[in-house]
Regions:
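Glycine-/small-residue-enriched transmembrane alpha-helix faces in small-molecule transporters
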Residues: 1-41, 45, 151-178, 199, ...
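Transmembrane alpha-helices of multi-pass small-molecule transport proteins
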Residues: 10, 34-85, 112-113, 167-172, ...
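Hydrophobic transmembrane alpha-helices of multi-pass small-molecule transport proteins
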Residues: 54, 125-147, 201, 256, ...
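C-terminal transmembrane-helix exit sites in multi-pass transporters
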Residues: 53, 58-62, 90, 109-134, ...
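Specific transmembrane alpha-helical segments of multi-pass solute transporters/efflux pumps
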Residues: 21, 25-26, 55-106, 142, ...
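Helix-helix packing/entry segments at the starts of transmembrane helices
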Residues: 42-45, 83, 87, 101-108, ...
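Transmembrane alpha-helical segments that form core, pore/gating elements
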Residues: 54, 113-115, 119, 150-211, ...
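Juxtamembrane helix-entry segments on the extracytoplasmic side of multipass membrane proteins
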Residues: 7-11, 36-44, 67-73, 145-168, ...
Length: 311
């Protein structure tokens, strides 16, 4: 009985840990830029740390990366959509946007994913789920339109820039949902994504003058970069564990925890305060996420069993 109870609680515990870690990353983004990290430079070093950790994980499992032409193309595309572009945008926005507000924009990912998937015909139209998309749009309007929503009106374009990151992640989700990509596995995909993101960002950081070398004395900048890389690696691996334990639909609830954790971390670390408009945006965004998340069907049971087999 105790073992059964523990088995039921484990996915919830993993969900909370994963959400808390990813939620912390928004505050760390503000810390790393305040410590002197440049957007392109931080994106490069974060990708290096995360990629090396996941590479060690894949090698330990004797499931190394496949480096034929097809897989290289996949790694480059997901590196651009899932790391290089969205991470850089987030780090450009981080100095100007509260950590809690940054975390709200991430909730747009599943909402935008459904909107784009419906537009290209890979998802069926659903009035309920479209209502969720509308809620997402309303939530962002509540953030950027009212005069009193943000501490400074100067933050508005940076909030919209952060929303572009969500668009990138949504496009990545749609690309990775293609059946022809399912043989790679999520952990190896994340490993290849980060290693290739580092390769992409290296010349960009050097050419833009944003490359920096971490100090061997390890100050705030260096520890925060390591923390960001560790969070991405650990949280992503935990995400795979949750899928295996409880299925992808259960794991999709991560968005709720990440947003709330991001807001709470911002309050705890920076003493952030939010207007009624921001809190209202959180509620509307959560409603949108709930509406756009697909309902479980009988067919999902088999999908849950196979969701992470190739990892």
């Amino acid at each position: 009985m105790a073992t059964l109870r523990l088995t039921k609680l484990l996915p919830w515990a993993a969900l909370l840990v994963m959400g808390a870690l990813w939620g912390l990353s928004f505050s760390l983004a503000r810390i790393v830029t305040a410590a002197g990290g440049t957007p392109f430079g931080v994106t490069f070093w974060q990708s290096v740390v995360c990629g090396v950790i996941l590479l060690g994980f894949t090698l330990a499992r004797r499931r190394p990366l496949t480096l034929d032409r097809r897989h290289l193309q996949i790694y480059v595309i997901v590196a651009l959509l899932g790391a290089s572009i969205p991470n850089s945008l987030f780090y450009f926005a981080a100095p100007y946007v509260q950590a809690g507000v940054l975390s709200i924009t991430v909730t747009l990912i599943p909402i935008i994913t459904y909107a784009v998937a419906t537009a290209i015909g890979s998802e069926r139209f659903s009035a309920v789920r479209v209502t969720g998309v509308v809620c997402g749009a309303v939530a962002i309007i509540m953030l950027v339109v009212p005069e009193s929503s943000l501490p400074s009106r100067a933050a508005m374009p940076w909030v919209l820039l952060a929303c572009l990151s969500a668009v990138c992640y949504a496009l990545e989700n749609i690309y990775l949902s293609r059946p022809s990509l399912q043989d790679i596995g999520p952990v190896r995909t994340a490993c290849g994504m980060n290693l290739f993101a580092a390769a992409i960002m290296l010349p960009i950081a050097l050419g833009s003058g944003q490359m920096f070398m971490p100090s061997l004395s390890f100050g705030t900048l260096e520890w925060t970069i390591i923390g960001l890389g560790l969070i991405n690696a650990v949280a992503y691996t935990t995400f795979i564990i949750v899928i295996r334990l409880a299925g992808p639909l259960f794991a999709s609830q991560t968005g709720y925890v990440v947003t709330l954790a991001g807001v709470i971390w911002g309050i705890y670390l920076f003493g952030e305060t939010h207007s009624a408009w921001v809190w209202g945006s959180v509620v509307v965004m959560m409603l949108g996420l709930a509406l756009v998340t697909p309902r479980r069907t009988d067919a999902d049971a088999d999908a849950d069993d196979n969701a992470a087999e190739a990892s």
